[in-house]
Regions:
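Aromatic-rich carbohydrate-binding modules that target alpha-glucans
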Residues: 1-7, 15-41, 72-114, 123-148, ...
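Primarily marks secretory-pathway-exposed extracellular/lumenal segments that are disulfide-
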Residues: 33-75, 143-173
Length: 173
């Protein structure tokens, strides 16, 4: 189209008139424009094909978000909190979590429904949490957190403590 290095706002219509347009509030791909319900795209300087998405969603229709969260209150955090797992080749330098305040770190990531994932939280990029066999972990030689992605967005609430399956000072989740 000749438009590069700028942000464009758009939305999909179900039919051929306004009133059948989607509302996208997810800040990953939407929540923009005059009514805060448009999609946005930062246009690169190369041809780009957008991934298919579900109407009014930022992800595919067969995907759900997993909302990772961990409580690291009391730990000295100088280089952030990360998530490393089966979905990113166990690379602690790919998925950085956001500081939500009061020692809580969060991140959302989309996965295909039915996928079983394993992960650990990594403090400062080098301190991997150590977990024992418990309700939120795998067994065997490597003990990792695990879950199977359902058709609903998944949140860990209450937020587990770093290195534990439990809320800080609480009972099993």
């Amino acid at each position: 189209s000749g438009v590069t290095d700028e942000t464009v706002f758009f939305k999909y219509l179900n039919g051929n008139s306004w009133g059948n347009d989607e509302t996208v509030s997810d800040p990953v791909c939407g929540g923009a424009g005059g009514f805060a319900s448009d999609r946005f795209l930062d246009v690169p300087d190369v041809d780009t094909v957008l991934d298919p998405v579900c109407f009014s969603e930022c992800i595919g229709c067969n995907e759900s978000y997993v909302h990772f969260a961990v409580d690291a209150d009391g730990y000295e955090i100088t280089d952030g909190m990360r998530v490393a797992g089966s979905f990113n080749a166990w690379d602690a330098n790919v998925d950085f979590m956001m500081d939500a305040g009061e020692g809580i770190y969060k991140m959302a990531k989309a996965f295909e429904e039915g996928t079983t994932i394993e992960w650990k939280y990594v403090l400062n990029g080098t301190t991997w949490e150590e977990l024992g066999e418990d309700v939120c972990t795998t067994g065997g030689g490597y003990i990792n957190r695990t879950t199977t992605v359902t058709d609903d967005d998944m949140m860990f609430d209450p937020v587990p403590c770093f290195g534990s399956c439990y809320e800080c000072g609480g009972a099993p989740l």
